[in-house]
Amino acid sequence: MGKRLISQNRGRGTPKYRSPSHKRKGEVKYRSYDEMEKVGKVLGTVIDVLHDPGRSAPVAKVRFANGEERLVLIPEGISVGEQIECGISAEIKPGNVLPLGEIPEGIPVYNIETIPGDGGKLVRAGGCYAHVVAHDIGKTIVKLPSGYAKVLNPACRATIGVVAGGGRKEKPFVKAGKKHHSLSAKAVAWPKVRGVAMNAVDHPYGGGRHQHLGKPSSVSRNTSPGRKVGHIASRRT
């Protein structure tokens, strides 16, 4: 009998395939959507900028006027000591948090809520931004980085600007060790070995005098887990 496939091993949930979330700095989300933000604004000061393992963008520690501290995603151009505003009457400038309904059309935004008060769900990767496209009664249309136009509640909050860390892809890894350390902070099994390059005991496509499948690549949806590789329940190949 052969060894278990990676897909079978992954289902067991060993540390190798788990996201090392214990290394992260903490929860990165907006402060609670209270009355202070709904009728006015809350001032906060950036007291530190941190690297968060497993995240493509830096995070800032912000201390608000009421003494509350939060980790937030910062835009390009924000540094330690600068002030940010959160609320319906906040100024339209990078780093400030406002409801979508109060943001003019064409302004780049990020960390967008899908439900008012959820803390931010969309457009959070380094260098990403969305655009406010249009406003209507009871809805705001936002164009996401994928090009999809999403209709959202105008009370959903977003941050003005472009997420910091956008130039990270321009610098090559150069060494395999750098790639290893980068992906070890995420739930990514790397390097990824091809099935035909394995031994017969490790994979259905392994073994042989040269690298070839040796069997049809299409398999049934109901086939056994140890054979379910290739084109699974394919309509065509």
Swiss-Prot record:
Pfam families: Ribosomal_L2, Ribosomal_L2_C. One of its GO terms (cellular component) is cytosolic large ribosomal subunit. One of its GO terms (biological process) is cytoplasmic translation. SMART domains: Ribosomal_L2, Ribosomal_L2_C. Residues 13-26, 228-237 have a biased composition (Basic residues). One of the primary rRNA binding proteins. Required for association of the 30S and 50S subunits to form the 70S ribosome, for tRNA binding and peptide bond formation. It has been suggested to have peptidyltransferase activity; this is somewhat controversial. Makes several contacts with the 16S rRNA in the 70S ribosome. Part of the 50S ribosomal subunit. Forms a bridge to the 30S subunit in the 70S ribosome. This is Large ribosomal subunit protein uL2. It comes from Methanococcus vannielii.
